[in-house]
């Protein structure tokens, strides 16, 4: 019994000792404070930005278009009476003088046989025919007399075939055309061309169609012909007053 008490007392002391150790350990655990970590502020981040591009220069202001210069309307020229046609008469070329043949040389005289008598040998007769005199040039006076009587005939004849273009009449176009044409001895128009335009293509075409339709003019006098033809330059008037 005593031994049992002694063991019980020993076990009780050991239990008390173990409990005391655990109590001390619990107290130390509770009083132990873990140092809190100090949070440092985040480091400042330096970001280097590229410089902004320079703004593009503004485009130059567009120049305002200049208004077109006002077109001055020129008044229509006053039509004057058509001048009389000029007829070109070429002067006939002067005939060239034929070269004269060389004069025959005289043969030397034979030696004299006797002093009292002399023998003279005549030169042989020349076989060259006598030179013909140049033909007289045609008289200019006769041409000038025949010119006034014929110069208006081609113009009057061609005027019968003249047509005023309808589009030119509507647009009020007027003008004077100068027509150059060559006529043979029979009055046939050999060639023609404009010597001076009126400034209107329609009137120019009408003049060329006029002489193309006519084809012929009155026969010219023979004394006006040069190598069988005569050249005429004549004006043709297109006027709204005359139609």
From Swiss-Prot:
Residues 54-151 are annotated as: Disordered. PROSITE patterns: TONB_CTD. Keywords: Cell inner membrane, Cell membrane, Membrane, Protein transport, Signal-anchor, Transmembrane, Transmembrane helix, Transport. Its main location: membrane. One of its GO terms (biological process) is transmembrane transport. One of its GO terms (cellular component) is plasma membrane protein complex. Residues 1-12 are cytoplasmic. Interacts with outer membrane receptor proteins that carry out high-affinity binding and energy dependent uptake into the periplasmic space of specific substrates. It could act to transduce energy from the cytoplasmic membrane to specific energy-requiring processes in the outer membrane, resulting in the release into the periplasm of ligands bound by these outer membrane proteins. Belongs to the TonB family. PANTHER family: PROTEIN TONB (PTHR33446:SF2), PROTEIN TONB-RELATED (PTHR33446). This is Protein TonB. It comes from Pseudomonas putida (Arthrobacter siderocapsulatus). The lineage of its organism: Bacteria, Pseudomonadati, Pseudomonadota, Gammaproteobacteria, Pseudomonadales.
């Amino acid at each position: 019994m005593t031994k049992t008490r002694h063991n019980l007392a020993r076990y009780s002391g050991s239990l008390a000792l173990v409990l005391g150790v655990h109590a001390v350990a619990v107290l130390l655990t509770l009083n132990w404070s873990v140092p809190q970590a100090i949070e440092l502020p985040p480091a400042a981040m330096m970001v280097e930005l590229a410089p902004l591009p320079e703004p593009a220069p503004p485009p130059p202001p567009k120049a305002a278009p200049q208004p077109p210069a006002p077109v001055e309307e020129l008044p229509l020229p006053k039509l004057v009476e058509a001048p009389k046609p000029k007829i070109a008469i070429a002067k006939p070329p002067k005939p060239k003088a034929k070269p004269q043949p060389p004069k025959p040389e005289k043969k030397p005289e034979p030696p004299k046989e006797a002093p009292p008598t002399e023998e003279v040998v005549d030169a042989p007769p020349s076989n060259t025919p006598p030179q013909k005199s140049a033909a007289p040039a045609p008289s200019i006076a006769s041409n000038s007399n025949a010119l006034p009587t014929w110069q208006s005939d081609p113009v009057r004849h061609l005027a019968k075939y003249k047509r005023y273009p309808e589009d030119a009449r509507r647009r009020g176009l007027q003008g004077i055309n100068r027509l150059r044409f060559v006529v043979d001895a029979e009055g046939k128009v050999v060639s023609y061309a404009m010597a001076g335009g009126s400034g209107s293509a329609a009137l120019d075409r009408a003049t060329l169609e006029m002489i193309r339709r006519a084809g012929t003019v009155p026969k010219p006098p023979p004394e006006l012909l040069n190598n069988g033809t005569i050249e005429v330059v004549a004006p043709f008037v297109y006027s709204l007053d005359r139609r």
